[in-house]
Amino acid sequence: MVHQLSLVSSIAHGSYVQTVSTLQAFTGMLSPQPIATYTLLTKPHEVFKPKFEPGKVNQIEQYYMKCITTWSDGSEFDLASAVIKENGSSNVFSGRLFHAEDESVQRIWTLQISDIPIAGKNQACSAQTIYESTLIHTHTNVKSEENKIDAMDVDLEHKDKSDVKGDTKEKEEDKKEEDKKEEDKKEEDKKEEDKKEEDKKEEEKVEKKNDEVKHSEVNLEDGAETGSGHKDSFLQFLEDLGYETISQYWIKGIRFFHGDIVIEIFKVLVRDDEVTEPKEEGKIALKLLDESNTFQIRTYINIAKSTDIDLINQGTKELLRLQEFLKNLFKLEIPDRMFMDSRVQVRK
């Protein structure tokens, strides 16, 4: 657990060289540390609804969890050059992290859950508590009961099953009242019910046909990728842990250090679904999340304990000094805390 103090900013692509040169002179780091992280965003697949009782505090909440590891594009990624599509094809690729042919591949994963930043009008910087756990996982292929879509296509919509018990009870009560009041109209009611049942049967047939078509399309697209009934062991681990994958993104950038302050300059990339056949086999085409080639900047300090007021005040002062020193280069600001809220909203 760490207590993180942070400020954020952004710069245009044309200001990247000037910003890097200034930070190199300011920090004394001629060769900044490269950043190449892959983040898998997961969500609890079972909603927990605590029983509310008077006189008891029920602040039990569920959170989205980030699973972070490193990635490589297999070539030198020049951040100084803009990422532009040429003839509809991407020039940025990532190797597949979850592939059916990979066996006994070890990767370091960081599981991260973050609380919403502290609220307040007099906050000088964003302050939030982050819980992390790092593990080394050996990726293998395991058998699964369900043959899901390609493991890298994590942006899937999971439909919830609706309860029909309440509707059936209401229909039964209505039928009883109608039978008591209108005994002479039983024949007409039966005819109407027969028509409704026939319509329902026809609708069910149409739905079954549509489901068969969808399943056949999925098997054609992904059967060669994942194999029948197999998937990556890390995805199986997340499923056993109670989480399902909902999104993914890649980060590429550089990192500077100034005392206890970490300064990161990076771009966010996502999967490019428009490129159906990448130039390089076994790799995924990527595109910028912000096509304007804007760089994101994040400066932060990690405090060991959220109760250490002296270190928190000292870290806040250091961030404010950095903000004042770099005000002519870029403006460091407090991010909106509502966009950093990772709590799962429960629908009542």
Swiss-Prot record:
Region called Disordered, residue ranges: 152-227
Residue stretches in coiled coil: 167-223
An example Gene Ontology CC term for this record: mediator complex
Keyword field: Activator, Coiled coil, Nucleus, Transcription, Transcription regulation
Intracellular or extracellular location(s): Nucleus
Biased composition (Basic and acidic residues): 152-218
Major localization class: nucleus
Record-level Gene Ontology MF annotations: transcription coregulator activity
Superkingdom of origin organism: Eukaryota
Keyword Coiled coil: yes
GO biological process entries: regulation of transcription by RNA polymerase II; termination of RNA polymerase II transcription
Homology family: Belongs to the Mediator complex subunit 18 family.
SUBUNIT field: Component of the Mediator complex.
Functional description taken from the UniProt entry: Component of the Mediator complex, a coactivator involved in the regulated transcription of nearly all RNA polymerase II-dependent genes. Mediator functions as a bridge to convey information from gene-specific regulatory proteins to the basal RNA polymerase II transcription machinery. Mediator is recruited to promoters by direct interactions with regulatory proteins and serves as a scaffold for the assembly of a functional preinitiation complex with RNA polymerase II and the general transcription factors.
Protein name from the UniProt record: Mediator of RNA polymerase II transcription subunit 18
Organism: Scheffersomyces stipitis (strain ATCC 58785 / CBS 6054 / NBRC 10063 / NRRL Y-11545)
Source lineage: Eukaryota, Fungi, Dikarya, Ascomycota, Saccharomycotina
Gene assigned in the entry: SRB5
